[in-house]
Design a protein with these regions (language model features):
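Alpha/beta enzyme core
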Residues: 2-204, 209-262
Length: 262
């Protein structure tokens, strides 16, 4: 039986129907008030999952504020995960690496694989999502995704926002910003479909907006992760509006995306 079956039923359905919306509070965001506000906006706007920094106190705070919203915790240190899972996290994520690139911290394929193996050894039954670093060439991203399946990953997440260099205004600029992660989602989805009898779901994240989340689903993703479009806002009503716009954009195309995957 797949470990994904251990997820809350609403989250399982969102993945299976290729309409998952994850709101990312930020791997380095340990401000409990800010994280709670983001989680509440995610829940009010119709998100399926909130991704927060790996801290048991934050998990407990979000669970209290939003009891129906599943929590994913992100870190690059596997030893941090067990306490967060014990506090109520539904799943764990190795990533999001974007926070480290400005510091010059780069994650290679071997390091990501080793982090995955260590996490799986610590938490053999917990759902594990792993981000494929966008700094790798696309063919190496594809190979790493396939290798991560063998290492115990349950979901694969793409990234790419920090490598994008949009130079246009409006919708065209939003598409340019999302191009790297969209390309990764397409390439990795195809690689997993070719290499695996039961391909893992792919989550497309980094640099997405309501304009580009439908493209992510069309590229083969089972869902999307959105961070800065929500967490950079200071007004909760504005956050809710953005999340709701993302939800509507996904729901408008999710039935078509699900049919294409059959």
């Amino acid at each position: 039986m797949s470990r994904l079956s251990s997820l809350p039923v609403t989250l399982r359905h969102a993945i299976a129907e290729r309409r998952l919306l994850k709101v990312i509070a930020g791997l380095t965001n340990f401000d409990a008030v800010a994280v709670e506000r983001i989680a509440q906006a995610a829940a009010a706007g119709g998100a399926d999952l909130v991704d927060i920094a790996c801290d048991p106190g934050l998990v407990a705070a979000v669970a209290t504020a939003c009891p129906q919203l599943p929590v994913c915790v992100s870190a690059v240190d596997p030893e941090l995960f067990p306490a967060a899972v014990a506090a109520g996290a539904a799943m764990v994520e190795i990533g999001n690496f974007d926070a480290f690139y400005p510091q010059g911290r780069i994650f290679g394929a071997e390091e990501v694989l080793e982090l995955t193996r260590r996490t799986r050894a610590l938490l053999p039954e917990v759902v594990l999502s792993v981000t494929v670093p966008h700094v790798l060439p696309l063919d190496q991203q594809e190979q790493l995704a396939v290798d991560l399946v063998a290492a115990g990953a349950d979901l694969i997440q793409t990234e790419g926002g920090t490598s994008a260099r949009p130079f246009s205004a409006g919708s065209l600029g939003l598409i340019e910003k999302a191009a790297p992660t969209l390309a990764a989602a397409h390439a990795i989805s195809r690689a997993l479909a070719s290499a695996c009898a039961d391909p893992l779901p792919v989550l497309c994240a980094s640099g997405l907006s309501a304009v580009t989340v439908p493209m992510a689903l069309a590229s083969g993703a089972a869902g999307v992760g959105v961070g800065s479009a929500v967490n950079r806002l200071s007004d909760e009503l504005a956050m809710v509006a953005v999340v709701r716009g993302l939800r509507e954009a996904i729901d408008a195309v999710a039935p078509v995306a699900a049919l294409r995957s059959v």
